[in-house]
């Protein structure tokens, strides 16, 4: 198999990026609410362990979970596997194709002094690529001991892209706010892997924190802080821990959103008495006001090309989503009815928003809408960088939890926390070059 030397460097970079953080007390974990029986079946065979003790983490289980979470695949249960090969040469294609499974992933994990060597092969069982039994993709990674999950997510990304022609987003992260039960600093901005693992605290405060937003290179978070008893916008460098106040105007300052090139931040402020959309140039600090007139304007979100901004306004009486260019001109209605918290996917094809109390997807080419959630009081949707998954918060019982739904609505899961309420999720951009 081909050895990817770049990966060891990637693991070091990704972990050093967050070196100044503190490990969180209680991690969130995915709890499946609705499966994907109608999705494409696939087999992720338990990886062979070449060590003397037990394997520290089930790599195949992580890969299965990733592919299942996308809504595109339905991994077969280990108990139903007709064979458990550990290499492509051991895969009996007819056995799998008779079950309707056209792709099988096999692999091995070998411990070494520095960590682990993880190798995998993706096997075509029906000959769609030419011959049954052909290896569609294969690789081998050297990973540090504390990065075995990242190695598994890397395999998931490669398998997903090979089978769908869509870049995988399983090595991305999510930022969110936790309000803990008690303590002197109960409000925390946290970051975790997209699936809730490897959670850590970015910042803790005695006052509320809100609305984290990622910079396009993933190195910074902008968020709202109510320290000093007033709302202010903070840009927080995740590597150095440095915090910069960029807006502390009288009234409310909120809903920060980085431009796609990272040079500007759009935000909402009521500094002149009415909530309006502003854009700040982060290089020189200049501010431009984009909206005006009666009504409140908030929740700015940039289009992928950086040429327009969608936002929520009640100028017509109730909250609706509008779009304007980056100078505040050409304002047009995007959502009919009670819509807010809009986000456009990275490819510009769909708009995800709150419509009524639920998550709704709108195809921007056809105008067709589809309700994706059936949870209660949904808020703050955020789309994965490949447009395949959506994370949001909802009310469950007396608290707030995170919810994950595939963009086709076929897979749904919860990411509850045992130590507080979770709000304001934000999906990171890609954190790796490929």
From Swiss-Prot:
Signal peptide range: 1-24
One Pfam match: PD40
Entry annotated with the keyword Cell division: yes
Function of the molecule: Part of the Tol-Pal system, which plays a role in outer membrane invagination during cell division and is important for maintaining outer membrane integrity.
Subunit text: The Tol-Pal system is composed of five core proteins: the inner membrane proteins TolA, TolQ and TolR, the periplasmic protein TolB and the outer membrane protein Pal. They form a network linking the inner and outer membranes and the peptidoglycan layer.
NCBIfam families: propeller_TolB
Name used for this protein in its record: Tol-Pal system protein TolB
Native source organism of the sequence: Histophilus somni (strain 129Pt) (Haemophilus somnus)
């Amino acid at each position: 198999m081909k050895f990817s030397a770049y990966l060891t460097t990637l693991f070091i970079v990704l972990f050093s990026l967050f070196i100044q953080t503190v490990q969180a007390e209680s991690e969130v974990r995915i709890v499946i609410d609705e499966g994907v029986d109608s999705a494409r079946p696939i087999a992720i065979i338990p990886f062979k362990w070449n060590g003397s003790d037990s394997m520290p983490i089930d790599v195949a289980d992580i890969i299965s979970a990733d592919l299942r979470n996308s809504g595109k695949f339905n991994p077969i249960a280990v108990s139903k596997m007709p064979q458990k090969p550990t290499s492509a040469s051991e895969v009996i294609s007819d056995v799998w194709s008779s079950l309707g499974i056209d792709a099988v992933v096999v692999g091995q994990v070998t411990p070494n002094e520095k960590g682990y060597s993880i190798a995998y092969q993706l096997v075509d069982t029906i000959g769609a690529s030419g011959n049954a039994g052909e290896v569609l993709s294969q690789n081998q990674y050297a990973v540090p001991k504390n990065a075995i999950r990242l190695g598994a997510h890397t395999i998931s990304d490669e398998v997903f892209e090979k089978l769908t022609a869509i870049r995988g987003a399983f090595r991305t992260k999510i930022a969110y706010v936790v309000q803990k039960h008690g303590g002197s600093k109960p409000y925390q901005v946290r970051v975790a892997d997209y699936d809730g693992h490897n959670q850590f605290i970015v910042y803790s405060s005695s006052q509320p924190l809100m609305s984290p937003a990622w910079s396009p290179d993933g190195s910074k978070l902008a968020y709202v802080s109510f320290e000093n008893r007033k709302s202010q916008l903070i840009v927080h460098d995740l590597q150095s821990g440095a915090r910069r106040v960029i807006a502390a105007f009288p009234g409310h300052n909120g809903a920060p959103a980085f431009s796609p090139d990272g040079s500007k931040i759009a935000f909402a402020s009521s500094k002149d008495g009415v909530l309006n959309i502003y854009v700040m140039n982060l290089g020189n600090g200049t501010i431009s006001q984009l909206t005006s007139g009666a009504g409140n304007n908030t929740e700015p979100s940039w289009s992928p090309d950086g040429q327009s901004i969608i936002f929520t306004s009640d100028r017509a009486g109730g909250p609706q989503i509008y779009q304007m260019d980056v100078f505040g001109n050409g304002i047009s209605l995007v959502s009919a009815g009670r819509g807010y918290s809009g986000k456009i996917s990275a490819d510009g094809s769909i708009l995800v928003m709150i419509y009524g109390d639920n998550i709704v997807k709108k195809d921007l080419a056809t105008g067709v809408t589809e309700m994706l959630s059936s949870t209660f009081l949904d808020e703050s949707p955020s789309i994965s960088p490949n447009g395949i998954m959506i994370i949001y918060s909802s009310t469950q019982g007396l608290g707030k939890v995170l919810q994950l739904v595939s963009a086709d609505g076929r897979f749904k899961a919860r990411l509850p926390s045992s130590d507080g309420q979770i709000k304001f999720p934000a999906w990171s951009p890609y954190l790796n070059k490929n």
